[in-house]
Amino acid sequence: MAKYKVGMVSLGCDKNRVDSEIMLGMVQNEYELTNNPKEADIIIVNTCGFIEKAKQESINTILDMAKYKTSHNCKLLIATGCLTQRYGDELLELMPEIDIMLGVNDYAKINEAIMNFINGNNEKVKATNYSDVSINEGLRLITTDKATAYLRIAEGCDNFCTYCIIPKIRGKFRSRALESIVEEAKKLAENGVKELILIAQDTTNYGIDIYGEKKLHLVLRELAKIEGIEWIRVLYCYPEAIYDELIKEISVNDKVCNYLDLPIQHISNNVLKRMGRKTTKEEIIGKINDLRKNVPNIVLRTSLIVGFPGESCEDFNELKDFIKTIKLDKVGVFTYSREEGTPAAIMEDQIDEEVKKAREEEIMLLQKELSEEINKNKLGREYDVLIEKFNGEYYIGRSYEMAPDIDGCIYVKGNGAKKDQFCKVKIEKALEYDLVGVVCNESCK
């Protein structure tokens, strides 16, 4: 009997991508995988439920995939992820198109759920409460470029920012054991991975729950010992949780990219307090200065929320002044999304959508100008570039200054560049977010 074909649509963040990779790793031995939903007998939609825009995309995708039940081969539609965890039975009632629903802690049940359905048991699985990080993440089927992989070091969050639903969806903060992280990283390196990107809802507090103190610096130190790993990149660092040992490890460890993602969300103390952020403007600026002083050529990325309830014109202008003065290398900006079940959703002084959008556009324009200025200062510099693809005219890759998907890229001219390899590139042209360079002779490895 021919194997059923399974297709996957993964939505949302890179943490969701890891969940999708775990599920694909679990089903690949039992079923044939396909990227074409027209061919799939079983379609899995791993949803995002973080903000309204993401929820709508997830719902639309489920409905789009449900059409393949009548037009093509789909016999089973499975919804998983944050949306299913957040809404549970309510989602099943609203969307009868879903045959099976699994929450963010139910991925180990994926094969059992599929087999039960095939055998005629049509009971719809419900989302369960969070548990420890117990799934063997080594079973993952990596979906990124061969040389790059995300490595989750913790799950859940204890910060409880007033705008965020994640603690209710993903549960309390739980660190993975260091031995488990290193074991998975070794397997990734054996399969050709050169860049590890460490992720969690909060990477900087790694270890505080299981070791009694923050141990991210130790994770970096141990991962750097693995043969084949060239870059280690850290995302989702809470600025108030950055500590001296971590800064020192970044500065002395050649394999750790001089790059940090610091989602500060705002700079006005008024807004930070209403957001429930455990820091202040003064502390944030102090931490940025410490990083720049102690880590040469460090690149700092952040994300900002505009239009938060009570954000005054003065608060917004303070944010603009901060961006102009501090000149962070990479900035992502989002309009506040009013999410039911969060304290911010019932706050007074909600901001009109038109005002939110105007503020978002103003920040984006400001950062665009700064980004072009920052990039022009890179002209003539040489970078080690990890080549990811060839578009027919240029090789395309990234330097240590660029995380995949969220930052720019480097368009590379010249002979010798190879996919999934590093090569030395000299920058010849600066664009708003991207760079153009030429391969330095005999530099690829």
From Swiss-Prot:
Pfam families: Radical_SAM (PF04055), TRAM_2 (PF18693), UPF0004 (PF00919). The keyword Cytoplasm applies. It is found in: Cytoplasm. Its cofactor is [4Fe-4S] cluster. Binds 2 [4Fe-4S] clusters. One cluster is coordinated with 3 cysteines and an exchangeable S-adenosyl-L-methionine. Its EC number is 2.8.4.4. This is Ribosomal protein uS12 methylthiotransferase RimO.
